[in-house]
Amino acid sequence: MAETFLFTSESVNEGHPDKLCDQISDAVLDACLAQDPDSKVACETCTKTNMVMVFGEITTKADVDYEKIVRDTCRNIGFTSADVGLDADNCKVLVNIEQQSPDIAQGVHGHFSKRPEEIGAGDQGHMFGYATDETPELMPLSHVLATKLGARLTEVRKNGTCAWLRPDGKTQVTVEYYNENGAMVPVRVHTVLISTQHDETVTNDEIAADLKEHVIKPVIPEKYLDEKTIFHLNPSGRFVIGGPHGDAGLTGRKIIIDTYGGWGAHGGGAFSGKDPTKVDRSGAYIVRQAAKSIVASGLARRCIVQVSYAIGVPEPLSVFVDTYGTGKIPDKEILQIVKESFDFRPGMISINLDLKRGGNSRFLKTAAYGHFGRDDPDFTWEVVKPLKWDNKVQA
C-alpha cells in the first residue's frame, strides 16, 4: 500500500449561529429576487441571545417584510424557545438596510442601463472551483461525510427519531487517503467527531448510542469504518446551551464548510446574502461548474480552476487551471477548452446559470449543508457541461 496521510473536514448544521445568519441573509435574497430579478442585494445578519440584526445594502422593487423573513427562518430551523437558544416569535429583530452605493451602481451596472454582457464585476477578487473523482458528487469525501452527518443530525431531530436533540451542532471527519499520482483515493475513515446540542434529560451514553445508530451508521459507508475508527461523540461532556445563546453568529464565517472542506483553495469571499453581480458568489459557482465538467468529462481526475476580477470590468483578469498531474492532456490545453466553453463575464454567468431566479427557497437551500455537490435542479452550477476534446490522446 502506498504511503497514506490524514485529512480532516468539518461542518456545522443549520442551527449553528453562523449558519442561521447565512440562511437569513439568503432568505432575504430569495425574497428580493422572487419579486425583482434585478435586485442588488448585499445582506448581512448577526445574532446573539434574544436578538437578530439584518443590515446591508439592498436596491430592489420588491416589497420585503424583513422581520417576517427573520422570524420564519429561525422558526423553521427549530429556534422556538429561549431554552433551545432563540425564540423566533419573541426575539428582538433589528433592521438597518440602505440602498446600494451609487458609485458602485454606476460602475457595475450603469444604474441598470448596461446589457448583460457589459455588466461589470461587483468587486475585485479571486475565486476557486474544485472537483475530485473520489465521490459520485465529484467532491472530497472528508467534506461530503462531515456535511451529510450534519444534515442527518437535523433530519433525526426534526422527524423525532432523537427527540433529545436541539438545533445547534458540529461535525468533523478525518479520512485516511493515499495519493495516486495526484488523485486522492480514500482508504478509511480515521475519526468521526460530533458535538451536538441536547436537552437536559439525556445521558452521555444515550447520546453516543443514538448518534452511532441513527446518524453515523446511515451516513458513513461500512467499507470506510473498521475497528480502529475513533469516535468522539460530544467529547466536552455537556452542550445544553446552544444557538445564538451559546455563541454570537455572523453571515459569511463558514466559507470552507460552504465549499470544499479545506481542499482546493479559497479566495476569501463569502456567498450568502449576495446577488449574482457579486462575483464572490457567481464567480465561485461558474468555476465549480468548470472544474466539475473537467473531471466528469475524463480530462482529469482532480482539478482546481481560479478566476479573478476587477470591479466594474466584465472580462475576468485571469483564468487558471491545475489538474495536479492527473490531466489526460496538458493543463494549458485544458485551460483553452475551459475558456472556449465557459463565459466568465458576471452578466453572462447570471444568464447561463439562471442566478437571478429567487423563490422556492433557492438560495436559502445553499446556505446550509454546502453549495456544491448537491443533487437539486436549483443548483444549476452542478450541471456538467460537455467539453469537446479528443480523448484518444493520452498525456
Swiss-Prot record:
Binds 2 divalent ions per subunit. The metal ions interact primarily with the substrate. Can utilize magnesium, manganese or cobalt (in vitro). Binds 1 potassium ion per subunit. The potassium ion interacts primarily with the substrate. Pathway: Amino-acid biosynthesis; S-adenosyl-L-methionine biosynthesis; S-adenosyl-L-methionine from L-methionine: step 1/1. The keyword NAD does not apply. Mg(2+) binds at residue 10. Keywords: ATP-binding, Cobalt, Cytoplasm, Magnesium, Metal-binding, Nucleotide-binding, One-carbon metabolism, Potassium, Transferase. Pfam families: S-AdoMet_synt_C, S-AdoMet_synt_M, S-AdoMet_synt_N. Catalyzes the formation of S-adenosylmethionine from methionine and ATP. The reaction comprises two steps that are both catalyzed by the same enzyme: formation of S-adenosylmethionine (AdoMet) and triphosphate, and subsequent hydrolysis of the triphosphate. Belongs to the AdoMet synthase family. This is S-adenosylmethionine synthase 3. One of its GO terms (molecular function) is ATP binding. It catalyses: L-methionine + ATP + H2O = S-adenosyl-L-methionine + phosphate + diphosphate. It is an enzyme of class 2 (transferase). ATP binds at residues 16, 168-170, 236-239, 247, 253-254, 270, 274, 278. PROSITE patterns: ADOMET_SYNTHASE_1, ADOMET_SYNTHASE_2. CDD domains: S-AdoMet_synt. The keyword Cytoplasm applies. Homotetramer. It comes from Populus trichocarpa. It is found in: Cytoplasm.
